[in-house]
């Protein structure tokens, strides 16, 4: 996914009220950008980090910029990280169209925001191609506390735990369901940050035990755009989840 307009570079001054970030542009101008990320952003919101903003062309929008990327000092070295949690669903849809998601190859359509469970909407419902419908839940990942290991979540994620329970319900009822973790950076493996949220850890493991599938993909991230790139293994006790090779 290429950014439609060139991103604007700046230096992070502070992130506050979760969804706001003050950024100093190269000419010294201070702007406030929308931070589309409700998480803790551990290791990513350090003052002085280089950031990239996408400008808005909507004259009615209150904030003229959205924070897209940060060049973070992570274990193993600096790298660009995507922090916009609105991007992963679009990245999955793009990868589906390009036949890059091996577990979903053969399906004809990927319909977004379909009602299911008690009171939820699944991110996607894959259907067609003579295959059983598949409920797909997408999670964004940008936490790295150990070199090469991406983790989720970076804060308590009660809603995500509920999603795992509802995916498990789909499989228990005879359907197919999967979790796709979109890692907006380079990594060699994925694991649950169980010390941060043991409830989500238990919910995911229980879902895997009943047959919910789980896949994790890193992304190629840079000033020009973000794209799903490489499958990586998931290190989850009680389940063996192999990386799903991309195709095409």
Swiss-Prot record:
Entries under Pfam families matching the protein: SfsA, SfsA_N
Gene3D superfamilies in UniProt: 2.40.50.580, 3.40.1350.60
Molecular-function GO term, any one: DNA binding
Alphabetized InterPro entries for the sequence: SfsA, SfsA_C, SfsA_N
PANTHER family per the UniProt record, alphabetical: SUGAR FERMENTATION STIMULATION PROTEIN A (PTHR30545:SF2)
Similarity annotation: Belongs to the SfsA family.
Protein name: Sugar fermentation stimulation protein homolog
Organism this protein belongs to: Methylorubrum extorquens (strain CM4 / NCIMB 13688) (Methylobacterium extorquens)
């Amino acid at each position: 996914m290429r950014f439609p307009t060139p991103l604007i570079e700046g230096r992070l001054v502070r992130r506050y009220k979760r969804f706001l970030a003050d950024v100093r542009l190269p000419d010294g101008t201070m702007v406030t950008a929308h931070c589309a990320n409700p998480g803790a952003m551990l290791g990513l919101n350090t003052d002085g980090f280089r950031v990239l903003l996408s400008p808005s062309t909507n004259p009615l929008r209150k904030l003229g910029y959205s924070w897209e990327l940060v060049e973070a000092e992570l274990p193993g070295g600096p790298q660009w990280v995507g922090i916009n949690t609105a991007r992963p669903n679009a990245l999955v849809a793009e990868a589906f169209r390009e036949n890059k998601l091996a577990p979903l190859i053969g399906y004809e359509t990927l319909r977004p925001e379909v009602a299911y469970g008690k009171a939820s909407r699944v991110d996607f419902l894959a259907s067609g191609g003579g295959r059983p419908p598949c409920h797909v839940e997408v999670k964004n990942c940008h936490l790295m506390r150990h070199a090469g290991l991406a983790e989720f979540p970076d804060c308590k994620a009660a809603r995500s735990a509920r999603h795992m329970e509802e995916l498990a319900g789909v499989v228990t009822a005879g359907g197919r369901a999967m979790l796709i973790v979109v890692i907006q950076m380079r990594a060699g493996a994925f694991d649950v940050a169980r010390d941060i949220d043991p409830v989500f850890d238990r919910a995911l493991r229980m879902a895997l035990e009943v047959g919910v599938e789980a896949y994790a993909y890193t992304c190629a991230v840079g000033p020009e755009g973000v794209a799903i790139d490489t499958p990586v293994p998931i290190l989850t006790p009680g389940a063996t989840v192999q990386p799903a090779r991309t195709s095409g």
